[in-house]
Amino acid sequence: MGRKRALDRVAMGCCVAAMPPEAFLPVQHDKSVRAKKTTSFLFILHIDNFFIIPYAESSRVPNETEERKMAENMVLSFDGTKLFVNKEVDMDCRAVCVIVHGLCEHQGRYDYLAEKMHEMGFGTYRFDHRGHGRSKGTKVFYSAFDEIAKDIDVVVDRAIAENPEAPLFIVGHSMGGYGAALYGHLHPGKVDGYVLSGAWTRDNKGLGTGAVEADTPDLAYMPNELGDGVCSDPSVGEAYMADPYVIKEMSFGLFRALHKGHAWMRENASRFVDPVLILHGGDDGLVAPKDSLELYEQIASWDKSLRIYAGLYHEIFNEYDKDAVIEDALDWLNLHADLEFIDVEEEEVEGDE
C-alpha cells in the first residue's frame, strides 16, 4: 500500500514548482567566517594512474568492540551482501530519515547532521554502501546502476517496519544523492520526501567521463583524489584523507554503472513525483550545480524546491555555513513531517467512483 503525504496546495503554495529557473538566484552568505578563499575549479580524474585489484572488500581491521557492534547492526541486502546500519531512533521520534552517504566515504561522516536531526526529534538510519566503510562487498564497485537503490530499499523497508506510523524521508549526498534520486524514480510514493545535497544525477562536470571511456577492466582502480574538492575548509579535506574508513581508491566499474544510471534518470525524469528539496553548492567543483538545476526542471514533482548556495563547495553539510544549510533542510523536513497521511490506493478508488 502506497505511502503519500496530503499536501495543502493553498498553504504550501504551488509557486514553488511554478517558479522559473532564473528565480533561483544563488543564496548569499557571510564570507567573513570562511576558512579560506573559495574559487571555482574543475576536478578531473587522472585515469593514467590506475591499478587492478581482482577482488577486494572494504577492509579496515575493526577492534573487538567494533566487531560486536558490526554483527549487531548488519542487514542482508537483496543479494546477501552484508550492510552496516547505524540506527539512532527514539521511541517517540516524530519522523525518520534514511541518510545516504557519498562516494568512497562512510556513514560516520554524517554525525553532525544526524545530531542536528536528533535535536529536532527526528530518528536516523545511516548505512555504509556495499564496498564502503564497515559494509561487505567488492570495494567501491557496482555491477549495475540500480544496485545502490536496491540497497537503499532494504534500509527503507527496515525503517518502515520499525516505525510504521512515522513519516519517512531520504537524505542523500553526492553519490548518495544519485542513489536517493534514483530510488525516487523507481519507488514513487514509498517515502514522504527527499533532501538531495550536491546530488550526482547528471554528471555535467564530466567527473566520470574518463573512467567510462578508458580501456580498462571494471575492477581496475584509480586513486581517490577527491579530498581537495570536498570542502573549502581545509581541515575537512585533511580529515577526509586521514579517515581510515574513507577508501582511497575507486573502481572504473562503479563510474560506468552510474553513467548508465545518469542516462536512465534523464530519460525517465517524469517518474519522479515526490516532494523534494534540492540543495547544491554554487562553487562545487566535483558535481556541477547544473545537475541539480536539470533535475529540478525535468522531474514531475509539483512540490519541489531548489537552493544553490553561492561560494560553497561540494560538501555543503560540512561547509563554513553548514548550520544555515542544515537549518534549511530541517525547516523543509519539519514542514513536510507535519502533513497528514493519505492512502494513495484508497484515494484512487474513490476517484474512480
Regions found by a protein language model. Give the residues of each.
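Acidic catalytic loop of the alpha/beta-hydrolase fold
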Residues: 283-287
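N-terminal cap/lid segment of alpha/beta-hydrolase-fold proteins
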Residues: 70-89
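Alpha/beta-hydrolase fold nucleophile elbow
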Residues: 163-173
